[in-house]
């Protein structure tokens, strides 16, 4: 495999193995909500999340990281707007205080976030609109979890991102991926170039597995199997 193609494959591997705090779809919603709040310039009074059917399916019953056990799209959006730091991207909810969790619960009870169905053929596609008084902001994400396709402030478009599926979000072009090249990369890549990424992945996955065995999560299938 030539060095140029190998570099692209290494870049793709790095992009696909980005650590995320929790299930990726709700984290993406929290990221968009945090970004929208930054554009708005203040804490929003109301949030509307327009989500594709696939997003709704993948988030509606998922526990949101650092939420204290709360679930769903509304929680992800409200917590992201209150406590999220968009510069941390997929670790946007890394730092959440008890006060912010309590505030999120209160806003959920007040129904400050509404979820709407977004009719889209793109599985990962959603928009988060936030508003306060007469001001509003909107962040649209397509294709990948942090690929911002559009940002609006008070109805005016202030940013247009990459809407191409293969390159969206500044990612390496996936069109270079073929079965033949993937096998060649796996056979020939020097281990020292992939070892740090793979070892981190193994460590994280083992930590998750041990936590699943020791804690009470979901239906408890892992415990019953072990």
Ranges and model annotations:
Residues 2, 17-26, 191-195:
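Short, N-terminal intrinsically disordered low-complexity segments that are rich in Pro/Gly
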Residues 8-21, 181-187:
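Generic N-terminal amphipathic, Lys/Arg-enriched alpha-helix
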Residues 26-42:
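Alpha-helical support elements that line or immediately flank enzyme active sites
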Residues 198-202, 209-214:
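Active-site helix-to-loop segments that bind/position phosphate- or nucleotide-bearing substrates
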Residues 225:
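Conserved small/polar residues in nucleotide/adenosyl-binding loops
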Residues 22-27, 67-71:
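Short, conserved micro-motifs enriched in small and acidic residues
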């Amino acid at each position: 495999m030539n060095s140029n193609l190998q570099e692209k494959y290494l870049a793709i591997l790095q992009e696909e193995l980005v650590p995320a705090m929790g299930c990726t779809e709700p984290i993406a919603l929290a990221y968009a909500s945090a970004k929208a709040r930054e554009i708005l310039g203040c804490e929003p009074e109301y949030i509307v999340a327009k989500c594709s059917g696939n997003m709704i399916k993948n988030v509606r019953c998922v526990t949101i990281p650092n939420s204290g056990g709360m679930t769903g799209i509304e929680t992800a959006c409200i917590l992201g707007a209150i406590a999220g730091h968009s510069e941390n991207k997929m670790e946007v909810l890394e730092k959440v205080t008890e006060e912010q969790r309590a505030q999120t619960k209160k806003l959920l009870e007040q129904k400050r976030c509404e979820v709407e169905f977004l009719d889209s053929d793109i599985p990962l596609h959603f928009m988060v609109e936030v508003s306060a008084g007469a001001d509003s902001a909107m962040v649209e994400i397509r294709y990948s979890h942090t690929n911002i396709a559009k940002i609006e402030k008070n109805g005016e478009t202030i940013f247009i991102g990459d809407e191409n599926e293969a390159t969206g979000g500044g990612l390496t072009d996936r069109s270079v991926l073929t079965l033949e090249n993937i096998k060649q990369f796996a056979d020939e890549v020097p281990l020292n170039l992939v070892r740090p990424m793979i070892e981190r992945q193994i460590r994280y996955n083992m930590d998750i597995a041990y936590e699943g065995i020791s804690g009470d999560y979901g239906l408890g299938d892992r415990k019953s199997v072990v």
